[in-house]
């Protein structure tokens, strides 16, 4: 045993051979899953449908955040944009453009 002590003093790296292995690496706990989104079905436009058809004013049971419109909404589309336009009762033009 005294001989081992001399060897360990002379060659300190020998101590690594008999040390217990480090504990296994544990992956961090996973984040909770995101809540599921409501899935909406896409409606594909037929070639025969007119893309510039005025839509009805949406009906809702809650009060609208903006004043109601005097004209129905109009929808215009291109290959990469969707534009919805309407005019409120006080004459303000509201345009929403979605870039796809």
Swiss-Prot record:
Disulfide bonds: none annotated. Keywords: Early protein, Host cytoplasm, Host G2/M cell cycle arrest by virus, Host nucleus, Host-virus interaction, Modulation of host cell cycle by virus, Phosphoprotein. It holds the Pfam family Pap_E4. GO terms for cellular component: host cell cytoplasm; host cell nucleus. It is found in: Host cytoplasm; Host nucleus. Belongs to the papillomaviridae E4 protein family. Assembles into oligomeric complexes. Interacts with host CDK1. Interacts with host SRPK1; this interaction may favor expression of late viral transcripts. Interacts with host cytokeratin components KRT8 and KRT18. The major E4 form is first synthesized as an E1^E4 fusion protein from spliced E1^E4 transcripts, such that the first few amino acids of the E4 protein are derived from the N terminus of E1. One of its GO terms (biological process) is symbiont-mediated arrest of host cell cycle during G2/M transition. This is Protein E4. InterPro entries: Papilloma_E4 (IPR003861). It comes from Human papillomavirus 13. Contributes to multiple aspects of the viral life cycle including viral genome amplification, suppression of suprabasal cell differentiation and egress of newly formed virions. Induces host cell cycle arrest at the G2 phase by associating with and preventing the nuclear entry of host CDK1/cyclin B1 complexes. Inhibits cellular DNA replication by preventing loading of host replication licensing proteins MCM2 and MCM7 onto chromatin. Within the cytoplasm, associates with host kinase SRPK1, a splicing factor regulator, and inhibits its activity. Phosphorylated by host ERK. The phosphorylation triggers a structural change that enhances keratin binding and protein stability.
């Amino acid at each position: 045993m005294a001989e081992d002590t001399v060897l360990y003093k002379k060659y300190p790296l020998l101590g690594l051979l008999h040390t217990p292995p480090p504990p296994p690496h544990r992956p961090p706990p996973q984040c909770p899953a995101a809540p599921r989104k409501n899935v909406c079905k896409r409606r594909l436009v037929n070639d025969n449908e007119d893309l510039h058809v005025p839509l009805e004013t949406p009906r809702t049971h809650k009060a609208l955040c903006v004043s109601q419109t005097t004209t129905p909404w109009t929808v215009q589309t291109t290959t990469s944009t969707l534009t919805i336009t309407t005019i409120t009762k006080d004459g303000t033009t509201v345009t929403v453009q979605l870039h796809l």
